[in-house]
Amino acid sequence: MAAAEMERTTSFDAAEKLKAADAGGGEVDDELEEGEIVEESNDAASYLGKEITVKHPLEHSWTFWFDNPTARSRQIDWGSSLRNVYTFSTVEDFWGAYNNIHHPSKLVMGADFHCFKHKIEPKWEDPICSNGGTWKMSFSKGKSDTSWLYTLLAMIGHQFDHGDEICGAVVNVRVKGEKIALWTKNAANETAQVSIGKQWKQFLDYSDSVGFIFHDDAKRLDRNAKNRYTV
């Protein structure tokens, strides 16, 4: 008999003996079988009833954020409708969340859905994001679901050589289609940013060129901001 099977069998026998003693008001048989360990009844019942679940921790904890601003809130204070949805730190908790949230093709028009490292807010003003920038990919309407998933898996799975440079990712749902952006924290680090852009394209098998815009440029120039790096 295998050691693991033996352990289960002896534990089960011991628990059964305890239950029999409790039911009859009697004492546990003093003559224990070889290798048998008798625990207190509560402990034995707990052992039998416990579901053993092994979880696999991620390199970092991550938080999903949702934003569906109205035109008014955009004008008054960008991010005022941003809300924290769920924080996860294991593979299993990620899938539990992902399988119970709307994917980009099912989100309402104008929505932004973010996944950022825990305690980093998806805002230019966040101190970790403030000196960074974004890589951005465009997709036809309803065609970004798989790429969004692959982006999340590569990001939370620490598949990027410069993964510590990554703050998070966001998918924007708009009338003309969806955009997925990777936010990084040090835009001036060209080596790291170009590496991230190239690997991201490889992970998603994305054939079009993608550009990187500094947050500072985006804040100053808005839609007129130009790509600093292109891959």
From Swiss-Prot:
Intrachain disulfide bonds: C129-C167
GO molecular function: RNA 7-methylguanosine cap binding; RNA binding; translation initiation factor activity
GO cellular component: cytoplasm; eukaryotic translation initiation factor 4F complex; nucleus
Keyword line: Cytoplasm, Disulfide bond, Host-virus interaction, Initiation factor, Nucleus, Plant defense, Protein biosynthesis, RNA-binding, Translation regulation
Main location per the UniProt record: nucleus
Composition-biased stretches (Basic and acidic residues): 1-20
Region annotated EIF4G-binding, chain positions: 56-59, 66-102, 150-159
One record GO biological process: translational initiation
Entry's localization field: Nucleus; Cytoplasm
Binding positions for mRNA per the UniProt entry: 74-79, 106, 124-125, 174-179, 219-223
Cleaved signal peptide residues: none
Ranges for region Disordered: 1-34
PTM statement from Swiss-Prot or TrEMBL: According to the redox status, the Cys-129-Cys-167 disulfide bridge may have a role in regulating protein function by affecting its ability to bind capped mRNA.
PANTHER family: EUKARYOTIC TRANSLATION INITIATION FACTOR 4E RELATED, EUKARYOTIC TRANSLATION INITIATION FACTOR 4E-1
Role description: Component of the protein complex eIF4F, which is involved in the recognition of the mRNA cap, ATP-dependent unwinding of 5'-terminal secondary structure and recruitment of mRNA to the ribosome. Recognizes and binds the 7-methylguanosine-containing mRNA cap during an early step in the initiation of protein synthesis and facilitates ribosome binding by inducing the unwinding of the mRNAs secondary structures. Key component of recessive resistance to potyviruses. (Microbial infection) Susceptibility host factor required for viral infection (e.g. Potato virus Y (PVY)) by recruiting viral RNAs to the host ribosomal complex via an interaction with viral genome-linked protein (VPg). Displayed sequence is the allele Eva1 that confers resistance to potato virus Y (PVY) by failing to interact with the viral VPg protein.
Family, per entry: Belongs to the eukaryotic initiation factor 4E family.
Subunit: EIF4F is a multi-subunit complex, the composition of which varies with external and internal environmental conditions. It is composed of at least EIF4A, EIF4E and EIF4G. EIF4E is also known to interact with other partners. In higher plants two isoforms of EIF4F have been identified, named isoform EIF4F and isoform EIF(iso)4F. Isoform EIF4F has subunits p220 and p26, whereas isoform EIF(iso)4F has subunits p82 and p28.
Stated name of the protein: Eukaryotic translation initiation factor 4E allele Eva1
Species of provenance: Solanum etuberosum (Wild potato)
Encoding gene (name): eIF4E-eva1
